[in-house]
């Protein structure tokens, strides 16, 4: 699998060994069989590792964990909670924007494209990196979880302090091993409409993250998003290109 994988160099240095394990060969076999049977997989193959490509290991300042990619047409592009330009903002992200506004006074963006966060050092990582079209959680238990565990371990072992935003019990269990003596671990219910009112609203994770980063001599995250994604980005991200 590693012969055909494009992975950002700092991540390749610490994760290259994962591609030599049998579970990754099994995962590759599964994905190939799914495609051969005519099943559509989201996101595109070149975007499986998009979160790692945009946020090199030595630049990670914040980690936000998701579960698996959006399974609707044109949504997923490799960053958790984020959708392509021109796609309606999903309900969980709408609630994230509401909390941002309450916390930092940032008006909700008119789009759901979070790439500018990733480029600043926010690792927007799903636990499972692929999904079958129209079938939520269809690729769970196929090996991605082991790979993304290795990603989180690599971040945890970095000397630079990092903020982990763990929303919902799934994310909190997955990152339970993070060293809280070095990193800031923020927990809250998931921003889903089903749970946001149980404690996500009012958690103020965004201001807490920036206060922690500043206290460690690190640049805070600019959580404001561009008013509109550049047209060139929209063309590049078109799902059928």
Swiss-Prot record:
The keyword Cell inner membrane does not apply. InterPro entries: UDG_fam1, Ura-DNA_Glyclase_AS, Uracil-DNA_glycosylase-like, Uracil-DNA_glycosylase-like_sf. The active site is at 68 (proton acceptor). Pfam families: UDG. GO terms for cellular component: cytoplasm. GO terms for biological process: base-excision repair, AP site formation via deaminated base removal. It is found in: Cytoplasm. Its EC number is 3.2.2.27. It catalyses: Hydrolyzes single-stranded DNA or mismatched double-stranded DNA and polynucleotides, releasing free uracil. Gene3D superfamilies: Uracil-DNA glycosylase-like domain. One of its GO terms (molecular function) is uracil DNA N-glycosylase activity. Keywords: Cytoplasm, DNA damage, DNA repair, Hydrolase. Belongs to the uracil-DNA glycosylase (UDG) superfamily. UNG family. Excises uracil residues from the DNA which can arise as a result of misincorporation of dUMP residues by DNA polymerase or due to deamination of cytosine. This is Uracil-DNA glycosylase. It comes from Rhizobium meliloti (strain 1021). The lineage of its organism: Bacteria, Pseudomonadati, Pseudomonadota, Alphaproteobacteria, Hyphomicrobiales. The gene is ung.
